[in-house]
């Protein structure tokens, strides 16, 4: 069978998910008899290799070949942020006036094990005419994907680069350098906060090594939705993990901060596809979570392990309740799940850099239907109690509209924050 392109794959996945939703699968799955049959069906389709190592079976397929993405032979002896390799990128669709380099650096995962992470540095060729060095924006994109081909460093070289909200061209027009970390890490651990923080901070360290002229640049971090996870966690972890790095500030919007809230707002609802993807992403950093997957859930995880965002989001049309796919009742209340939820709730310590948080608010119009505002306002309060300088802005719109509505204000905040550092 020929390999499907990402748009075709997304269309088929969306169609299948829609059909499942129309058929009332969400209701049917709540039947124990139906789940037994589905688990039996899935069990017969598992390979011996998948049975032998269930954790390995849900990891993303490595990018093949001996090139840039080949695993480094040995990371011992490397310091976090040390550059392993770097290469220039020529996109299939040429973009005049910019230079693109992607690089791999040493980092650590959630458990503290050495891992390689990748990032992309996009620089205007025009000389910087302002005072001081050229400003840098660390743009943490909402990758929201499980497959390595969806990482920004891979997409940008293939002319299928996606930026949501579309800040990148506006930042380059201001003659800023833009760093794009692959913040989900080498396992595409979507939604895992500590891994994302390490990937971002070590990418910044690596940037200062391949572009030493940017080492003293005023720098801000930015991210929305899945990218906000990386931004918030990097801001919180910076004083402990990378205290030598200086940031002028960080801005994050539509931030998922509390998976207990997301379990109520997304699971079994239109956001169930991305909630399921985030669950798989967390399991890649917390292998004990795989013990909770029933055979049907595990089989699905092996099927979608390389999917990008569109088909994962479209799967929400089926409105599947993940709780019924587990091997135990109320899996979200289990010690394993609660430990992961607690470990991925920011607020235990406060950032030292100024932070702007914004969110679609019912107080303005509509409100974010996927990511409840109360999680962000709680984080604002906790960080302020810890001594952080945090500004909060309630903006009109649901999750997608709020991203666009906030853009002018976010760009002004970036400009003012960067100029204040000169």
Predicted segments with their positions:
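Short, surface-exposed "cap/lid" segments of acyl-processing enzymes
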Residues: 109-173, 182-184, 368-370
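Catalytic-loop region of hydrolases
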Residues: 15, 19-118, 123-126, 384
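Alpha/beta-hydrolase active-site loop
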Residues: 163-167, 190-213
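Short beta-strand/loop motif that positions the catalytic acidic residue
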Residues: 351, 357-364
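Catalytic active-site module of serine/aspartate enzymes centered on a nucleophile-bearing elbow/loop
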Residues: 386-422
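Accessory cap/linker subdomain of secreted extracellular hydrolases
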Residues: 38-74, 255-350, 367-370, 376
């Amino acid at each position: 069978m020929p390999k499907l392109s990402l748009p075709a794959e997304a269309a088929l996945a969306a169609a299948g998910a829609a059909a499942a939703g129309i058929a009332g699968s969400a209701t049917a799955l709540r039947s124990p008899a139906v789940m037994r049959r589905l688990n039996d069906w899935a069990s017969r389709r598992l390979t011996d290799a998948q049975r032998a190592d269930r954790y390995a079976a849900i990891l993303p397929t490595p990018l093949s070949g001996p090139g840039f993405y080949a695993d480094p032979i040995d990371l011992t002896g490397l310091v976090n942020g040390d550059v392993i390799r770097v290469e220039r990128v020529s996109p299939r669709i040429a973009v005049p006036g910019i230079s693109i380099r992607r690089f791999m650096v040493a980092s650590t995962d959630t458990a503290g094990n050495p891992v390689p992470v990748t990032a992309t540095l996009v620089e205007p060729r025009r000389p910087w005419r302002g005072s001081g060095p050229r400003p840098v924006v660390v743009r943490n994109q909402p990758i929201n994907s499980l497959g390595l081909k969806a990482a920004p460093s891979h997409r940008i070289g293939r002319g299928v680069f996606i930026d949501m909200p579309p800040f990148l061209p506006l930042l380059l027009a201001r003659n800023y350098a833009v760093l794009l970390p692959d913040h989900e890490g080498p396992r595409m651990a979507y939604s895992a906060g500590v891994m994302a923080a390490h990937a971002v901070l070590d990418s910044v360290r690596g940037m200062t090594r391949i572009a030493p002229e940017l080492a003293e640049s005023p720098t801000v971090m930015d991210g929305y939705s899945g990218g906000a996870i990386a931004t918030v966690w990097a801001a919180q972890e910076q004083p402990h993990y990378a205290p030598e790095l200086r940031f002028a500030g960080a801005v994050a919007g539509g931030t998922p901060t509390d998976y207990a809230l997301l379990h109520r707002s997304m699971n079994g609802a239109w956001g169930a596809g991305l909630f399921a993807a985030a669950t798989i992403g967390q399991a890649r950093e917390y292998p004990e979570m795989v013990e909770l997957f029933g055979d049907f859930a595990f089989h699905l995880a092996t099927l979608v392990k390389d999917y990008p965002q569109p088909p994962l989001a479209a799967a929400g049309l089926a409105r599947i309740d993940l709780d019924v796919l587990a091997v135990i009742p109320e899996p979200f209340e289990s010690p394993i799940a609660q430990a992961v939820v607690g470990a991925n709730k920011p607020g235990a310590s406060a950032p030292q850099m100024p932070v702007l948080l914004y969110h679609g608010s019912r107080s303005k119009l509509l409100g974010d239907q996927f990511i409840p505002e109360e999680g962000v306002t709680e984080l604002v309060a906790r960080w302020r109690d810890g001594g952080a300088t945090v500004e909060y802005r309630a903006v009109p719109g649901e999750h997608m509209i709020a991203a666009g509505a906030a853009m002018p204000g976010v760009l002004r905040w970036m400009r003012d924050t960067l100029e204040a550092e000169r």
